[in-house]
A protein has these predicted regions:
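N-terminal leader/targeting and assembly helices and adjacent pre-domain segments
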Residues: 1-176, 260
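Acidic, glycine-rich two-metal-ion catalytic cores of nucleic acid-processing enzymes
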Residues: 173, 177-260
Length: 260
């Protein structure tokens, strides 16, 4: 396959994945926006009640916070809201990851060759939920880890603002920042998993076409990356454990080696 057709095929694969990434981002922004509004209202209401509970001019402390029934009620509400956010993310990602696998698998068509389809829904569900990273965690575990981290850091910011005598407006700003951090982590998980799924789907499609070798193809911009550039056009047996993606937002892919 010459460079022109290789670039076109790589661009086509990336377009399929980018379409699904954009669909996830659109829905994820809605989920985060709703959750953030609910959580911040709870925190702001609790902080204002705390400030109103002490004598005028007195400095509130974290110990005062723990005496408020409102604080413990807020904890339950925030836990419920973040749990719902996690559930929605898991459901959304699971569905779109499956869709992405099928989009890539059936989006690959090699002229002059006949493919024997060997994929089904159960197989795809198994593939997208496989643990493949060195830390031994699945993408869903990372989502729940982030939910727990977010709840902890939101509470930490509340305590810090109380201890430092910050105004409620400063607390709101810090909470918004932490929701932004969580959203970006979720986006990184999405992009990494989509890239991995693209590789798995392509490998299976090539196998079903009877392809013997694949070629690591770095996006034109990625060729300046020392890791991606070093592997550009390196060949592997089809089905080999190729290190893709190499980094977050990696746009490299595997292309079939087809004799002209």
């Amino acid at each position: 396959m010459n460079n022109y057709w290789a670039d076109r095929m790589a661009a086509s694969l990336n377009r399929l994945s980018n379409k699904n990434i954009k669909a996830i981002e659109k829905q994820m922004r809605k989920y985060y926006g709703t959750a953030m509004k609910t959580v911040i209202n709870e925190f702001e209401s609790t902080y204002n009640k705390l400030l109103a509970s002490v004598a005028e001019g007195a400095q509130v402390t974290p110990a005062d916070l723990y005496k408020l029934d409102k604080y413990w009620q807020m904890q339950g509400q925030v836990r419920h809201t973040l749990q719902a956010l996690g559930d929605k993310k898991i459901s959304l990602l699971g569905k779109v990851f499956e869709m992405n696998y099928f989009d890539v698998y059936y989006g690959i068509n090699i002229d002059g060759l006949e493919a024997f389809n060997t994929i089904d829904n159960a197989s795809v569900k198994h593939i997208i939920n496989q643990i493949w990273c060195a830390d031994g965690k699945s993408w869903s575990q990372r989502i729940w880890d982030d939910v727990s981290r977010l709840q902890q850091v939101l509470n930490d910011r509340l305590i810090e603002c109380i201890a430092l005598g910050k105004k409620p407006t400063e607390l709101i700003k810090q909470l918004q920042e932490q929701f932004g951090v969580s959203y970006r982590r979720a986006d990184a998980i999405t992009r990494t998993e989509i890239a991995h799924i693209q590789t798995q789907a392509a490998q299976q499609r090539y196998t079903d076409y009877g392809i013997q070798e694949v070629e690591f193809w770095a996006d034109e911009d990625e060729r300046r990356c020392p890791d991606c550039g070093a592997l550009h056009q390196k060949r592997y047996p089809v089905g080999a454990a190729v290190p893709l993606p190499l980094h977050p937002n990696c746009r490299c892919c595997l292309l079939p080696v087809v004799e002209d």
